[in-house]
Curated annotation (Swiss-Prot):
Catalyzes the methylthiolation of N6-(dimethylallyl)adenosine (i(6)A), leading to the formation of 2-methylthio-N6-(dimethylallyl)adenosine (ms(2)i(6)A) at position 37 in tRNAs that read codons beginning with uridine. [4Fe-4S] cluster 2 binds at C158, C162, C165. This is tRNA-2-methylthio-N(6)-dimethylallyladenosine synthase. The gene is miaB. [4Fe-4S] cluster 1 binds at C16, C52, C84. HAMAP family: tRNA_metthiotr_MiaB (MF_01864). GO terms for molecular function: 4 iron, 4 sulfur cluster binding; metal ion binding; N6-isopentenyladenosine methylthiotransferase activity.
Length: 444
């Protein structure tokens, strides 16, 4: 590389949607510093691994990726490990992987340029602070997006302290971004071509703020204000906690046309005994009541969930109760995982840790039921007309892929249309993970 060539960077994000958002913000920040993006880490001058610590497998994958960055001549790029693994393991990362130059937690990544500068001077630059001031004010303003959809972090951190979860320790206490900042960022995204925004938070429905008139509002109020923005066609939010599904938010699902009929509401288990051990602070009955009320407000809503199988002490009867809540809820989709023992969490030292073989067998049974429900939900859409936002090209000539209001991928052959267009379609076929459709008419 010539000395006057701009330095290149590659950001690889693991895990949740908020990590995707954080990765995009880091990329924007590096772009403002004169770096240009590289397609992958093989030839980049700087590689940022934006990590996830929710499960052991995701955390260990980071070290595998670090090892693969070593080049044939023995050199490595400047390597920065960001995100929740960085926060949880800190200097241990640099000890295990000496090629790592920068370790930065999720609340300090706005300092990434100065940490890189320190690394280039030969220092091991580590910043795990959780500063009181908001990192968001230090980030560059949002620019053109190139895609019709975008994430917008409105809330970070969690105060729930579920006994299996590292998020309160890696992301910190719950904070809500100011209303005015969120409206400004949303407007910048829409000006850059975004038509759908997903509001993000570890506990997104705990967001609170004050509107332009100084009135206290919750997430439902923010959604109603965003819905007034011309050019913004769709609004989603994730991830929610059952205890923070307020009356106002439930009502908004029935009243705000731009709020998509989709709700991701994790329950994790169907046994009150296990929910108590998890410190979920809700019961099976209260969860099902929320689902009932949401469906009363928006009958066509798609419900998504999260499940953990094999939590310490889970009996066969407890697991059977999880299958029961799945049958009662009728999920459109759901994510299910084996319990992952995370150091530092209360569940890691609980008695009656479940054997791996038992967890595997239970996970297979749960996923079979969830897959059956997902297929049934998809098949129920066949013959319906709906509106798609076209997001990317398909594999076939003239084929585009969009998202339905219920978050399914929909394949449609629509010559003359482009990514970012909206189109009315009729659903013609349903698979386990996607739908097929025929176009009816384009919408400007």
């Amino acid at each position: 590389m010539k000395s006057d060539s701009p330095k290149t960077f590659h950001v690889k994000s693991f895990g949740c949607q908020m990590n995707v958002y954080d990765g995009e913000r880091m990329a924007e920040m590096l772009g403002a510093e004169g770096y240009v993006p590289a397609a992958d880490g093989a030839d980049a001058d700087l590689v940022v691994l934006n990590t996830c610590h929710i499960r052991e497998k995701a955390a260990e994958k980071v070290y595998s990726d670090i090892g693969r960055l070593k080049r044939d001549d023995g050199s490595t790029p400047t390597i920065a490990v960001a995100g929740c693994v960085a926060q949880a393991e800190g200097a241990e990362i640099a000890r295990r992987a000496p090629s790592v130059d920068v370790v930065v937690g999720p609340q300090a990544y706005h300092r990434l340029p100065e940490l890189i500068a320190r690394a280039e001077r030969g220092e091991k630059a580590i910043d795990l602070d959780m500063p009181a001031e908001s990192k968001f004010g230090a980030l560059p303003k949002r620019s053109g997006n190139q895609r019709p959809t975008a994430f917008l972090t409105v809330q970070e951190g969690c105060d729930k302290f579920c006994t299996y979860c590292v998020v309160p320790y890696t992301r910190g206490a719950e904070i809500s971004r100011p209303f005015a900042d969120l409206i400004a960022e949303a407007r910048a995204l829409v000006a850059g071509g975004v038509r759908e925004i997903t509001l993000l938070g570890q506990n997104v429905n705990a967001w609170i703020g004050e509107d332009a008139k100084g009135r206290a509002i919750g997430l439902d109020g923010l959604i109603r204000e965003l819905a007034k923005e011309d050019g913004l066609e769709r609004i989603r939010y994730t991830t929610s906690h059952p205890n923070d599904m307020t009356d106002g938010l439930i009502v908004a699902h029935g009243e705000v046309d731009k709020l998509m009929p989709f709700l991701h509401l994790p329950v994790q288990a169907g046994s009150d005994r296990i929910l108590a051990a998890m410190n979920r602070s809700h019961s099976v009955e209260s969860y099902l009541k929320v689902i009932e009320r949401v469906r009363e407000a928006r009958p066509d809503i798609a419900i998504s969930g999260d499940f953990i199988v094999g939590f310490p002490g889970e009996s066969e009867a407890d697991f059977a109760a999880t299958l029961d809540i799945v049958r009662a809820t009728r999920y459109a989709m759901a994510y299910s995982f084996k319990y992952s023992r995370r150091p530092g969490t209360p569940a890691a030292t609980m008695d009656d840790q479940i054997d791996e073989a038992v967890m595997n067998e239970r996970l297979q049974r749960l996923q079979a039921l969830l897959n059956e429900q997902q297929q049934a939900f998809n098949e129920a859409t066949v013959g319906r007309t709906t509106r798609l936002l076209l997001e990317r090209k398909g594999k076939r000539e003239g084929q585009l892929i969009g998202k339905s209001p219920w978050l399914q991928s929909v394949h449609v052959t629509a010559p003359g249309l482009a990514i970012g267009d909206m189109i009315d379609v009729r659903i013609t076929s349903a698979g386990p993970n996607s739908l097929g459709a025929e176009p009816l008419m384009a919408i400007a």
